[in-house]
From Swiss-Prot:
GO molecular function: mRNA binding; RNA 7-methylguanosine cap binding; RNA cap binding
Pfam family of the protein (one): MIF4G
Phosphoserine modification, residue list: S29
Assembly information from the UniProt record: Component of the nuclear cap-binding complex (CBC), a heterodimer composed of cbc1 and cbc2 that interacts with capped RNAs.
Function per UniProt: Component of the CBC complex, which binds cotranscriptionally to the 5'-cap of pre-mRNAs and is involved in maturation, export and degradation of nuclear mRNAs.
Name of this chain's protein: Nuclear cap-binding protein subunit 1
Family recorded in the similarity comment: Belongs to the NCBP1 family.
The keyword Lyase is annotated on this UniProt entry: no
Length: 780
């Protein structure tokens, strides 16, 4: 008889059962509420979900009003709205309209929201969180339809009064000025107060004092030209644009005003007025320092047909501000950031931009009343401005690469023509570009091609193969192809190029150039013994015995070169192997390398000989060898100076110089942070001065020697200007952090990444070349 008892079988008790009185519980009500409403608020007015923004706002507002039962629940809702405003600021007008719409059923929401954002505004100012304060003020401005007249004026006046008393620029002063100027157009567009334009004029007059004082401190270089230093600084330009807008009666028709969809309903709202707290601002010494100035980056002003707002139009600054805020504050999700950017036109008024994907050659045929601005050009210009427009990027360059890649994946037919125009423009301008701009652009271009099967219309550039080998256009092609080889395999890159351009590929690498592995080499036996001694960790005395052999003594090869080449061979299987060799044989390697400066130069020279056909590997290894103090920074500069002058036109040289000087800067910063030890500061300063002067004097001498060779002089001058502008005077607040100590570095770097013997390397050598590793293998 079966023992089965059907549904009457008792449930088995577990450790978490009745015996212990434990039951998994659901989260508290506020956590559940946040989870329910977060998605609705985040995707508010998103064109992917609802093509009609008014319907979406109405739907979400009804949902929120049902949830808003008490002050605690309303606070949770406002926290979600503020978070969304921070990461997707382009939706601020829609979020403000959502609050007003929800308050029709729950008036307490509006009262709480006005008080909440007003309090957050002053709190963030006191905490020096200027971006957050800018967003909070804009939220209040876009809610002004439901605020009492004059409520917002003190929020502007307090900042304007503070900066009007300043006689020199400061970090806090520039940020106050930005908050005021960039929010004034929104204030005028959203406010129904009859005196709003007079108030805007008063604020601009107050700001004029500070703007005039800061002009004398502005020093800028043009990232798109080595000849033209005339550049418009962002805040100075924004002020000029608003002054010009005054002549047009402050008209900003492109700013979205979604609250107008509900004007007939909003007449029933009782306006509120949040209390303005007594506020005093006390800046720290860091906030009183001289600010960093940023040039307004323009690319599309060089085309015959203008597809972006003119620099004199405040729309240029408004679109750039919104785009850059999305780029810099949605960085944790580049796919979503790319989606918001490609939908940029949706968040401004209808017909602000030409239809997506409209060919440039068709723009002149449009009706004169129709816009010729292309949203895709605006976002590409904004991303490239962040990548190319300043010496120090906010994030690693690979983030901006990946963002452009995602934009192109989302809307390839729309963005591909824009990318093509930019690439051709930069190629044409290559002889005028500063070194850093050229290097970063080539880095992006090669990375971008690697994600789209390396397809490019190379045939357009075939005639330029006949140019001099050092001509910037030919260098542009050659170094792009070199970077592609790092991201793929030789045969694949070769197949993607027309026959005429394959001469730029160079010789196909078959692996490291370890000359002693050939059995016919006179030192084959000794090199094998050295490798075995290193592998078995034999004492230094036994190595010395091997080096005393007659074959080595009679050879032209020095002991330093032989030992280092054998060590390189041991570490050539992967990057992990290289780090292990440096760590385990550190004392042995230092014994040979640090005998003299000449020995260190030999170590560097042997490394580049070992990676003869893959010099980026050598740059990557040198970065780690500097961490382990196997060589000094001076030895790298000395080695560079002794090479053929054509080396200054190679991108691996640019990366090597950048890596070397970043190490100097990091050491200086680390020594400055250790205030108790003044000797460290003096030593770091002395090292920086010696190395910088060594390179600068050598470059000037080489320029003088090669004055008759136009393109050799061109590359030497580019490097000279690059070093002078980036490293001649290192500011404490712009120096990059030093690498971790050797012990920590080695533990972090134990990754089993294979170093391809042909041409594919998973990890690239410098900050500007992190595309393969940090992009999480975009191609795959």
């Amino acid at each position: 008889m079966s023992s089965y008892r059907g549904s009457t079988r008792p449930r088995k008790r577990t450790r978490e059962g009745e015996n212990y009185g434990f039951r998994p519980h659901r989260g508290n009500s506020q956590e559940l509420l946040a989870a329910r409403i977060k998605k609705d608020i985040t995707f508010l007015a998103d064109p992917r979900g609802n093509s009609v923004a008014a319907d979406d706002i109405n739907y979400v507002a009804m949902s929120l009003s049902r949830e808003a039962n008490d002050p605690e629940t309303i606070s949770t809702i406002l926290d979600c709205i503020q978070t969304t405003a921070f990461i997707i600021p382009v939706k601020i007008p829609h979020l403000a309209t959502l609050i007003i719409r929800a308050s029709l059923r729950v008036p307490l929401i509006l009262e709480k929201a006005a008080a909440y954002f007003c309090l957050q505004y002053f709190t963030n100012l006191n905490s020096f969180l200027y971006y957050e304060a800018k967003v909070d003020l804009r939220m209040l401005i876009c809610m002004s339809f439901a605020l009492q007249p004059g409520t917002l004026k003190p929020l502007f006046s307090l900042l304007a009064d503070a900066i009007s008393k300043e006689t020199k620029p400061s970090v806090w002063g520039d940020n106050f000025l930005r908050i005021i100027l960039i929010n004034l157009p929104y204030f005028i567009a959203a406010n129904n107060d009859l005196g709003k334009k007079d108030f805007a004029n008063e604020i601009l007059d107050q700001c004029e004092i500070y703007v005039r004082h800061r002009k004398s401190s502005i020093t800028l270089s043009n990232p798109l030209s080595i000849h033209d230093n005339l550049s418009e600084e962002e805040l100075d330009l924004l002020y000029k644009q608003l002054i010009l807008s005054r002549e047009n009666d402050f008209t900003f028709p492109y700013i979205s005003q979604p609250w107008k969809f509900f004007e007939s309903d909003f007449v029933h709202i009782v306006p509120v007025s949040p209390s303005i707290p007594e506020w005093t601002f006390q800046p720290t010494p860091q906030q009183n320092e001289l600010p960093s100035f940023k040039r307004f980056f323009e690319l599309f002003n060089n085309f015959e047909i203008r597809t972006t707002p003119d620099a004199s139009d405040v729309a240029a600054s408004i679109f750039r501000d919104i785009s850059v805020d999305v780029i810099n504050h949605l960085e944790f999700n580049r796919v979503e950031a790319a989606q918001v950017l490609t939908d940029l036109d949706v968040y401004f008024t209808y017909k602000t931009f030409a239809l997506r994907g409209t060919p440039v050659n068709e723009l002149p045929n449009l009706d004169p009343s129709e816009s010729r601005w292309k949203a895709e050009d605006i976002i590409v210009e904004a991303v490239l401005g962040e990548l190319l427009g300043s010496q120090n990027t906010t994030y690693k360059p690979v983030y901006y690469h990946s963002l452009l890649i995602e934009c192109c994946r989302i809307a390839p037919k729309i963005l591909a023509p824009t990318f093509g125009r930019v690439i051709r423009l930069m190629y044409t301008m290559s002889s005028d570009l500063p070194l850093q701009t050229l290097d970063r652009f080539i880095d992006w271009f090669s990375h971008h091609l690697s994600n789209f099967n390396f397809h490019w219309k190379w045939n357009e550039w075939i005639p330029d193969v006949e140019l001099d080998d050092l001509h910037p256009k030919k260098v542009f092609m050659r170094e792009t192809i070199t970077r592609e080889l790092i991201l793929s395999y030789y045969t694949r890159i070769s197949d993607s190029l027309p026959e005429e351009l394959r001469c730029l590929l160079g010789e196909q690498p078959s692996g490291p150039n370890f000359v002693y592995e050939n059995e016919t080499h006179p030192l084959y036996q000794q090199s094998s013994q050295i490798i075995e001694a290193l592998r078995l960790h034999k004492p230094l005395e036994e190595l010395d015995i091997i080096l005393q052999s007659e074959e080595i003594q009679n050879s032209e090869t020095s002991a330093v070169r032989l030992v280092m080449s054998c060590a390189y061979s041991l570490g050539s299987r992967s990057f992990s192997h290289a780090l292990n060799v440096f760590e385990k044989h550190l004392n042995t390697l230092k014994h040979f390398s640090r005998k003299s400066l000449d020995s260190e130069i030999e170590v560097v020279d042997e490394l580049f000989s070992f990676w003869k056909l893959q010099p980026f590997n050598a740059v990557m290894w040198l970065d780690k060898m500097l961490n382990y103090s196997i060589i000094s920074i001076t030895s790298i500069i000395e080695w560079l100076i002794k090479q053929d002058v054509t080396i200054w036109s190679r991108s691996y040289t640019w990366s090597l110089v950048n890596t070397t000087f970043n190490k100097l800067a990091a050491r200086l910063r680390r020594s400055v942070s250790n205030k108790e030890d003044s000797s460290l500061i003096n030593e770091a300063n002395e090292e920086k001065e010696i190395v910088t002067n060594l390179l600068l004097s050598a470059l000037r001498a080489l320029i003088s020697e090669n004055a008759e060779n136009i393109w050799v002089s061109h590359w030497l001058n580019l490097m000279l200007k690059y070093v002078e502008s980036n490293f001649l005077s290192v500011k404490k607040d712009t120096i990059e952090e030093a690498n971790e100590p050797v012990q920590e570095n080695t533990s972090e770097e134990q990754e089993d990444t294979k170093m391809q013997p042909v041409d594919a390397v998973d990890e690239q050598p410098s900050e500007n070349n992190q595309t393969a590793a940090d992009a999480t293998n975009e191609e795959k």
